[in-house]
């Protein structure tokens, strides 16, 4: 629901950090091009856990976008302030692997959905976790993802290789077969289709 509050904890450019914690009138581009959205607020990941917890409790978003590595300390700090953000419905985790224990903790202690998004600064969202099977689905509408072995050949299902991406929508600086430094295991086709 784009009309609800969105909170973001992630790396922010130095110029953007001056607005840490300020409430803005929408979620920003590209959402603003398609939908009218509710208020948003962002904090730089470099803030102290105490500052992030105070902001989260005060802003009380419905959705939180953050890195997995900050969530356990953040949950501990919020618990020390009396529990959980009451309006929070979903935590969207980006850029790092998500530990199953963290997913379980979010579901148990905060009673929220946890969405795992595989992403990279260079290309944005790469894949979303399937709610039916748990595998990651590549966002093939916006990029081509290859998992290549040491010889530069596509890996077979079950094999691990280097992640190479080609952005299909970046008109300013096209990334062609860009190796992002990650490794992934190729899965079998998902039963969801």
Predicted regions and their residues:
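Active-site glycine/GP-rich loop and adjacent strand/helix microenvironment
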Residues: 34-193
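Conserved AMP-binding loop of ANL adenylate-forming enzymes
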Residues: 1-33, 39-43
């Amino acid at each position: 629901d784009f009309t609800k509050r969105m909170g973001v904890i992630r790396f922010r450019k130095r110029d953007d950090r001056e607005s840490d914690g300020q409430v803005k009138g929408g979620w920003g581009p590209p959402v603003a091009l398609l939908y009218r959205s509710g208020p948003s607020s962002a904090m730089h990941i470099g803030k102290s856990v105490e500052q992030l917890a105070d902001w989260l409790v005060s802003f009380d978003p419905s959705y939180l976008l953050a890195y997995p590595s900050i969530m356990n300390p953040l949950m501990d700090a919020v618990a020390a302030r009396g529990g959980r953000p009451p309006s929070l419905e979903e935590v969207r985790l980006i850029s790092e692997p998500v530990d199953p224990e963290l997913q379980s903790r979010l579901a148990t202690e905060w009673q929220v959905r946890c969405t795992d998004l595989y992403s990279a600064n260079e290309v944005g969202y790469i894949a979303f976790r399937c709610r039916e099977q748990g595998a990651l689905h590549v966002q093939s509408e916006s990029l081509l993802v290859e998992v290549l072995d040491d010889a530069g050949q596509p890996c077979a299902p079950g094999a691990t290789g280097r992640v190479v991406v080609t952005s299909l929508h970046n008109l300013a600086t096209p990334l062609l077969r860009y190796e992002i430094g990650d490794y992934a295991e190729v899965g079998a086709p998902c039963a969801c289709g």
